Design a protein with these regions (language model features):
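Structural motif
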Residues: 41-50
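Solvent-exposed loop and beta-edge segments used for protein-protein assembly and interaction
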Residues: 32-34, 93-95, 108
Length: 139
């Protein structure tokens, strides 16, 4: 009975390995279980958080409009908006993509944009912010 159970478990393990063949292209990677998010702060001319409307994140490589996919994208810090999270990593290249982030101030109706470079990809454990503004300030 023990031999049958052992053979059955080995068979299941082999089938599981074959189903995960697509991830084997990435080599042996150890990833953490954290969930990474990246965002941007919109501020008024005094540096205080500014509420915005019409938040837009456009991948400049693909033209695709991106949205943070997690329910954690709602921020409790005024003016800070989560724009992407690990659920978006397959929409990004490993080299990093330029993302045009745009928002319109509710107070002044002024629209401002910034470019932020974020990487991801099939083999990435998490998204990673490479460069770009961390704050957009309205006049």
């Amino acid at each position: 009975m023990k031999k049958i159970t052992l053979v059955l478990l080995m068979g299941i393990a082999l089938v599981a390995c074959k189903k995960n063949k697509s991830t084997s292209d990435c080599g042996n990677k150890m990833c953490t279980e954290e969930f990474v998010m990246t965002g941007i702060k919109f501020a008024d001319k005094n540096g205080a958080g500014a509420e915005i409307k019409d938040l837009s994140v456009i991948n400049q490589r693909t033209g695709e409009k991106l949205y943070a996919k997690s329910s954690a994208s709602i921020s409790t810090v005024k003016g800070y908006y989560v724009v992407l999270d690990d659920a978006n990593k397959l929409q990004l290249s490993e080299q990093g993509d330029d993302l045009k982030i745009t928002g319109t101030s509710i107070t002044t109706n002024q629209t401002k944009s910034a470019i932020v470079k974020v990487s991801g990809g099939k083999c990435a454990c998490h998204i990673s912010r490479i460069s770009g503004a961390e704050q957009i300030t309205f006049d």
